[in-house]
UniProtKB/Swiss-Prot annotation:
F-type ATPases have 2 components, CF(1) - the catalytic core - and CF(0) - the membrane proton channel. CF(1) has five subunits: alpha(3), beta(3), gamma(1), delta(1), epsilon(1). CF(0) has three main subunits: a(1), b(2) and c(9-12). The alpha and beta chains form an alternating ring which encloses part of the gamma chain. CF(1) is attached to CF(0) by a central stalk formed by the gamma and epsilon chains, while a peripheral stalk is formed by the delta and b chains. This is ATP synthase subunit alpha 1. The gene is atpA1. Its EC number is 7.1.2.2. The record marks S360 as: Required for activity.
């Protein structure tokens, strides 16, 4: 088509066009309080739609009624007054995603909290997205190496799994999740930490710990502290999962820690009561299970056809006096693929991490565990559980049987090995060597303190012996197992001699 013909066609189009003013529906704030605005006049507004107030504040539609809707504010409610005008945006809440977020601290709307420099992203995604369909998922077959011996050996987490970390207040829940993040320093996983309703000082400590021990350039921190609006706290986990989904959908692997969903449930209850939704058990609204289920179902291992990426979720929940049968804990336990239960009594006894081996479980991660690690950790849980039971009865006296004494001695060495300091992750090869040596009785004659010291020195010794190869993906062959056990035995014997102030012998120490 020539330029003249095109120009003539456009003139005909313009001739048929009747200019008219653009009509925009305006709403009105009828009343406002506690972070909730009740708005009238927007009959066409949709649920979860983003609205703008004339002061510049924003909020999303939470409930719809015949002539009134409740809008949850995402900003300071002091700038919104009754009688103010409200306009629709025709869009839902979106969050920026992409490589530009790595190393940054943002709020759930993507606004920077660490510095004035804006976030360098070019793409935005809605925070509410459907979970992958069953046919789009693959089996959980690759491990997430947390570096925590008791977790990797007994309650292994796989890529694409949802493993709940639950326990009373101040029992090391965040510390355990933080150790898992720090251990990804040399892996290919992108880590997203979501803080909901936490103290700003506590969040700052987490960020500083990752910067000191981990790889902050491969982490994203989504923060909605206790002082922020309830609406921001409510959308925080959805924003964090959306950021993680961006990397998962590109064939990469992401780990998201949500700290914590108990506070998120309390925020959801607060918003429901303020908007006069019917309360249910423990005053939570009836949809609280659905809210958390649709969030955590987005964690998945995608099929090879979709790139094979994964999103692993480590949600955290807080219990009251160890009550796992409360409403929110039972909901989350039924939604997730397992739970790591932290016990306050173990924590008080200086057993850290304070994992309760009797109540903890990983339903799918065992299939993703390294075959060599699975082989050497087979009896660990049973031996340790028997030790805890025998130790309790031995306090009353009367257990003088040599077999019982041997089990108690073995259990004390197990406890010394799994009592792991923070920010001291173990490589998988170190874990295999320790457990193989434990099964061979290397630690039986040594004091528990020797086992702890041997664990600290093992990594350097194995690197020097060239034992850090990727042989863990196959069953442990006898020659490799013997080499690992010999290395650990030499360390234990040397430490034992040093403790007795006897010069260490040279040679193999056999």
């Amino acid at each position: 088509m020539s330029d003249d013909a095109w120009l003539a066609a456009q003139r005909k189009v313009l001739a048929r066009t009747a200019p008219a003013p653009y009509a925009d529906t305006l709403g009105r704030v009828e009343r406002i309080g506690d972070g909730i605005a009740f708005v009238s006049g927007l009959a066409d507004a949709a649920l979860d739609e983003l609205l703008r107030f004339e002061s510049g504040a924003s909020g999303f539609v939470h409930t719809l009624e015949a002539d009134l809707m409740s809008v949850v504010l995402l900003d300071d409610g002091a700038t919104v007054e009754a009688g103010a005008r409200v306009t629709r945006t025709g869009a839902v809440i979106e969050v920026p995603v992409g490589e530009g977020l790595l190393g940054r601290v943002i709020d759930p709307l993507g606004r920077p909290l660490d510095r004035d420099e804006p976030v360098a992203t070019v793409k935005r995604m809605p925070i509410e997205r459907p979970a992958p369909a069953i046919i789009d998922r693959d089996l959980v077959s690759e491990p997430v190496e947390t570096g925590v011996l008791i977790v990797d050996a007994l309650f292994a987490v796989g890529r694409g799994q949802r493993e709940l970390i639950i326990g009373d207040r101040a029992t090391g829940k965040t510390a355990l999740a933080l150790d898992a993040i720090v251990n990804q320093k040399h892996s290919d996983m992108i880590c997203i930490y979501v803080a909901i309703g936490q103290r700003s000082t506590a969040v700052q400590q987490v960020i500083e710990s990752v910067r000191r021990y981990g790889a902050p350039e491969r982490c994203v921190f989504v923060v909605a502290p206790a002082a922020s609006a309830a609406g921001l706290q409510w959308i925080a986990p959805f924003a964090g999962v959306t950021i993680a989904e961006y990397f998962r959908d590109r064939g990469q692997h992401a780990l998201v820690v949500i700290d914590d969903l108990t506070k998120h449930a309390a925020t959801h209850r607060e918003l429901a009561l303020l908007t006069r939704e019917p309360p249910g058990r423990e005053a939570y609204p009836g949809d609280i299970f659905y809210v958390h289920a649709r969030l955590l179902e987005r964690a998945a291992k995608l099929s090879a056809k979709l790139g094979g990426g994964s999103l692993t979720a480590l949600p955290i929940a807080e219990t009251d006096a160890g009550n796992l049968s409360a409403y929110i804990p039972t909901n989350l336990i039924s939604i997730t693929d397992g739970q790591i239960v932290l016990d306050a009594a173990l924590f008080a006894a200086n057993q850290r991490p304070a994992v309760d081996v009797g109540l903890s479980v990983s339903r799918v991660g065992g299939k993703a565990q390294h075959p060599a690690l699975r082989e050497v950790s087979g009896r660990l849980r049973l031996d340790y559980a028997q030790f805890l039971e025998l130790e309790m009865f031995s306090r009353f006296g009367g257990l003088t049987d040599a077999h019982v004494a041997g089990k108690i001695a073995r259990g004390e060495r197990i406890r010394a090995l799994i009592a792991q300091p923070r920010f001291r992750p173990l490589r998988t090869v170190d874990e295999i060597a320790l457990l193989a040596a434990l099964a061979e009785g290397v630690f039986d004659a040594a004091p528990p303190a020797i086992a702890t010291e041997a664990r600290a020195q093992l990594a350097e010794q194995l690197l020097g012996a060239g034992m850090a190869a990727g042989w863990m993906d196959a069953p442990l062959d006898p020659a490799t197992q013997a080499a690992l056990v010999t290395t650990v035995r030499e360390i234990v014997q040397r430490l034992t001699l040093e403790a007795a102030n006897v010069p260490a012998r040279t040679g193999s120490g056999k």
